[in-house]
């Protein structure tokens, strides 16, 4: 990650409105990963990441920041919900499976990168195999005779036709590696055992091939993947993935507030304090056994987030609070924020609906006053009922464009037809009554 914090924030601004404090915190944390890797070895091992706790109501951008960060980081990343895990010894997934899933994500990410590197070689090898199936390979000897020369010319002709796609629908018989896939169902918490069994069965069937009749287009795709897989060095891939997890891994733990013990609640709760205590060694730094080998979690960055409606950050066990030293508060959205969300981000909601309906030949145009009124209604409904943040806009837009979306396929629309204008009057006529009536808005919006 060679992007500066300012560049990271600028990139996040393309998709997320407001929440500058949270963006700055994650940008600095991400840049610190790069800074650490520039240090001498003896100092590098001493520098641990400063984990982050994001606090804010639902629908203000906590999860979206994590999603966008994952794309920017180009590093092993996993998002989990704290509520999915149970204390060790109970039925359910234990927290160590987070690191096992992170290891899987690292292998997938690095394999994709390696396949891109060997793509051209794989395409050449796949092309030769398809040509071998279409006609016998040309043999060029010391005393080449005209028949062999013409054979070579035929091969070149077929190669040209193959590249131009003229042979795509031709059926050929080709030897393909036999995939040995075994579906194994197991109770929650036993994923590691099922993975090991699946790997065992896959290794047993390795090297077996079977003859299949396929169209050239399908065969070329399968053979290309097969050849790319052969060119990737699995041992080297695992070593790189292990280093990527340990040095650059990022874990985003959502809904951390749901495992906080609320002030006056008593009794034992399996999914709460026990999960927090299991998370402690993971965040502090421990060793977890994965398919890559033993993974040290000392330098994995953990970002936790929660709405904290019914509990407070201080309800988390003190040790966990200490392991999340950077606190960032995300603010509730204002009507102006809703207005910007509808119009400013790359691939905003209004742009998505406009392009979706354009596929039917229907043009819609969102007027500034219509967007402003829509933002006001979203804010009002959130204030009167449950505040679900920007997610309210999805509900309102679906309701607003329901009739248009339903009948768009039946309308014979001429290319020169004027666009449907979504202005303040249109918004009021479709949503005004629902927004004013609190009982209706509770159930419909």
From Swiss-Prot:
SMART domains: AAA, ClpB_D2-small. One of its GO terms (biological process) is protein unfolding. SUPFAM superfamilies: P-loop containing nucleoside triphosphate hydrolases. The keyword Amino-acid biosynthesis does not apply. It is found in: Cytoplasm. Signal peptide: none annotated. Keywords: ATP-binding, Chaperone, Cytoplasm, Nucleotide-binding, Stress response. GO terms for cellular component: HslUV protease complex. InterPro entries: AAA+_ATPase, ATP-dep_Clp_protease_ClpX, ATPase_AAA_core, Clp_ATPase_C, HslU, P-loop_NTPase. ATP binds at residues 17, 59-64, 254, 319, 391. GO terms for molecular function: ATP binding; ATP hydrolysis activity; peptidase activity; proteasome-activating activity. Disulfide bonds: none annotated. PANTHER family: ATP-DEPENDENT CLP PROTEASE ATP-BINDING SUBUNIT CLPX-LIKE, MITOCHONDRIAL-RELATED (PTHR48102), ATP-DEPENDENT PROTEASE ATPASE SUBUNIT HSLU (PTHR48102:SF3). Belongs to the ClpX chaperone family. HslU subfamily. A double ring-shaped homohexamer of HslV is capped on each side by a ring-shaped HslU homohexamer. The assembly of the HslU/HslV complex is dependent on binding of ATP. ATPase subunit of a proteasome-like degradation complex; this subunit has chaperone activity. The binding of ATP and its subsequent hydrolysis by HslU are essential for unfolding of protein substrates subsequently hydrolyzed by HslV. HslU recognizes the N-terminal part of its protein substrates and unfolds these before they are guided to HslV for hydrolysis. This is ATP-dependent protease ATPase subunit HslU. It comes from Pseudomonas syringae pv. syringae (strain B728a). The gene is hslU.
């Amino acid at each position: 990650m060679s992007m500066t914090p300012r560049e990271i924030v600028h990139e996040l601004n393309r998709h997320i409105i407001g929440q500058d404090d949270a963006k700055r915190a994650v940008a600095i944390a991400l840049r610190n990963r790069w800074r650490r890797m520039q240090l001498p070895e003896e100092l590098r091992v001493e520098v641990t990441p400063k984990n982050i706790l994001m606090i804010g109501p639902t629908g203000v951008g906590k999860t979206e920041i994590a999603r966008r960060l994952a794309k920017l980081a180009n590093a092993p990343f996993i998002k989990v919900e704290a509520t999915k895990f149970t204390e060790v010894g109970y039925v359910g997934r234990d927290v160590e499976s987070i690191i096992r899933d992170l290891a899987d994500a690292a292998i997938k990410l690095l394999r994709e990168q390696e396949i891109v590197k060997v793509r051209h070689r794989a395409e050449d090898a796949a092309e030769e195999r398809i040509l071998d199936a279409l006609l016998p390979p040309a043999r060029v000897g010391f005393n080449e005779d005209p028949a062999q020369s013409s054979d070579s010319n035929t091969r070149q002709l077929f190669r040209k036709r193959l590249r131009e796609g003229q042979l795509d629908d031709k059926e050929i018989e080709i030897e393909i590696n036999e995939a040995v896939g075994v579906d194994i169902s197991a109770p929650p918490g036993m994923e590691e055992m099922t993975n090991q069994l699946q790997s065992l069965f896959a290794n047993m069937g390795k090297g077996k091939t079977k003859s299949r009749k396929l169209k050239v287009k399908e065969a070329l795709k399968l053979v290309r993947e097969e050849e790319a897989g052969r060119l990737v060095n699995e041992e080297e891939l695992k070593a790189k993935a292990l280093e990527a997890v340990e040095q650059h891994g990022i874990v985003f733990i959502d809904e951390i507030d749901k495992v906080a013990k609320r002030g006056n609640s008593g009794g034992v709760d399996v999914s709460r304090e026990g999960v927090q205590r299991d998370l402690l060694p993971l965040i502090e730094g421990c060793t977890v056994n994965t398919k890559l080998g033993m993974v040290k979690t000392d330098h994995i960055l953990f970002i936790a987030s929660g709405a904290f409606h019914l509990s407070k950050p201080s309800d988390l066990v003190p040790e966990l609070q200490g392991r999340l030293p950077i606190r960032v508060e995300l603010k509730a959205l204002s009507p102006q924020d809703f207005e910007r969300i509808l119009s400013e981000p790359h691939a905003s909601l209004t742009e998505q609906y406009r392009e979706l309906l354009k596929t039917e030949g229907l043009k819609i145009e969102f007027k500034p006053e219509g967007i402003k009124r829509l933002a006001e209604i979203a804010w009002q409904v959130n204030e009167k009922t449950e505040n679900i943040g920007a997610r309210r806009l999805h509900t309102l837009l679906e309701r607003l464009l329901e009739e248009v979306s339903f009948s768009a396929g039946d309308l014979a629309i001429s290319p020169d037809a004027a666009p449907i204008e979504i202005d303040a009057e249109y918004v009021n006529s479709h949503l005004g009554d629902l927004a004013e009536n609190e009982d209706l808005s509770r159930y419909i919006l």
